[in-house]
């Protein structure tokens, strides 16, 4: 496995592979890797000839400096996991490498997909995501890029970003990996106590209850949201950020629960903010 710390090293290796006719797959991460990331690596390896993983905690996407400071780091463990999964190249830059002149004063937006969810509750977050992805795509020049659907809005934004700018990159969304009890795997879970992990299972239970209500025939989104919210309100440890039911393609509000549907929750368990979602396909009447 090759480990690169500069864009020049990455570009040199990628150009060599492309000269050999190899297709490049890319999985950008912020490190503290877990089995959810490993599933992205496996998807990438199955589709691409060469797999590149980046590990970079991007300061531009944190609207809370304390959240950035507390983001977990385990570089040694991350490299071991990448090697065990047969990743070909790990790009391990630092902040000065990605932003040599500091974080630039440029704003990247896709307004139609940034009217709700994390775009509203974390101002500036997705602008920072799009900025770093733009740079990483420039350095890695991938044919395919893989993103987990746990961060569903991010996946939609990056897919639309590539389409709008005519990047020759296929953006592939991969299903959320969960614990045996249903908790979506996340690097932030490491900051939860065992009691908080138990409480956080209510997020998935709320989503599954919403799914069951919709498939039972309920068409009113407000009614389903109230039923889902009751589950979360049963715990004093959960502080709801948002609970939304939206069109899964456009992120627009729904008046009737039909077609492609996104159920999305963000909530704080203690100081830790977790997100999760389900997507449903409901036949129209």
Curated annotation (Swiss-Prot):
Leading EC class: ligase
Keyword terms of this UniProt record: ATP-binding, Cytoplasm, Ligase, Nucleotide-binding, Pantothenate biosynthesis
Pfam families: Pantoate_ligase
SUPFAM superfamilies in UniProt: Nucleotidylyl transferase
Catalytic activity: (R)-pantoate + beta-alanine + ATP = (R)-pantothenate + AMP + diphosphate + H(+)
Keyword field contains Nucleotide-binding: yes
Protein purpose: Catalyzes the condensation of pantoate with beta-alanine in an ATP-dependent reaction via a pantoyl-adenylate intermediate.
Subunit and interaction comment: Homodimer.
Keyword RNA-binding belongs to the record: no
Cellular component terms (Gene Ontology): cytosol
Binding site for ATP: 30-37, 148-151, 177, 185-188
Compartments in which it is found: Cytoplasm
Binding site for (R)-pantoate: 61, 154
GO BP annotations listed: pantothenate biosynthetic process
E.C. numbers: 6.3.2.1
Pathways involved: Cofactor biosynthesis; (R)-pantothenate biosynthesis; (R)-pantothenate from (R)-pantoate and beta-alanine: step 1/1
GO MF entries: ATP binding; pantoate-beta-alanine ligase activity
Active site: 37
Name of the protein described by the UniProt record: Pantothenate synthetase
Family affiliation: Belongs to the pantothenate synthetase family.
InterPro entries: Cyt_trans-like (IPR004821), Pantoate_ligase (IPR003721), Pantoate_ligase_C (IPR042176), Rossmann-like_a/b/a_fold (IPR014729)
Other observations noted: The reaction proceeds by a bi uni uni bi ping pong mechanism.
Source species, domain of life: Bacteria
Positions of beta-alanine binding: 61
């Amino acid at each position: 496995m090759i480990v690169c710390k500069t864009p020049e090293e990455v570009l040199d290796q990628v150009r060599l592979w492309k000269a050999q006719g190899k297709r490049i797959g890319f999985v950008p991460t912020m490190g503290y890797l877990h089995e959810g990331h490993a599933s992205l690596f496996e998807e990438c390896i199955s589709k691409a000839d060469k797999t590149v993983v980046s590990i970079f905690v991007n300061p531009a996407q944190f609207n809370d400096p304390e959240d950035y400071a507390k983001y977990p780091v385990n570089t040694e463990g991350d490299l071991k996991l990448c090697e065990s999964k047969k990743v070909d190249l790990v790009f391990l830059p630092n902040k000065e490498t990605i932003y040599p002149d500091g974080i630039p004063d440029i704003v990247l937006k896709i307004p139609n997909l940034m009217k709700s969810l994390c775009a509203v509750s974390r101002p500036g977050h997705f602008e920072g995501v799009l900025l770093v992805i733009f740079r990483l795509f420039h350095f890695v020049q991938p044919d395919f890029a893989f993103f987990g659907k746990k961060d569903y809005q991010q996946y939609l934004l990056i897919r639309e970003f590539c389409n709008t700018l005519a990047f020759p990159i296929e953006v592939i969304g991969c299903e959320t990996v969960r614990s045996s009890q249903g908790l979506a795997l996340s690097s932030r879970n490491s900051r939860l106590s065992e009691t908080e992990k138990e409480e956080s299972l209510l997020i998935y239970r709320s989503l599954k209850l919403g799914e069951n209500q919709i498939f039972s025939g309920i068409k009113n989104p407000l009614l389903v949201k109230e039923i889902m919210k009751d589950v979360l309100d049963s715990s004093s440890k959960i502080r709801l950020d948002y609970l939304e039911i939206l069109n899964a393609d456009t992120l627009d509000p729904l008046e009737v629960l039909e077609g492609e549907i996104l159920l999305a929750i963000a909530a704080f368990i203690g100081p830790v903010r977790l997100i999760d979602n389900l997507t449903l396909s409901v036949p129209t009447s």
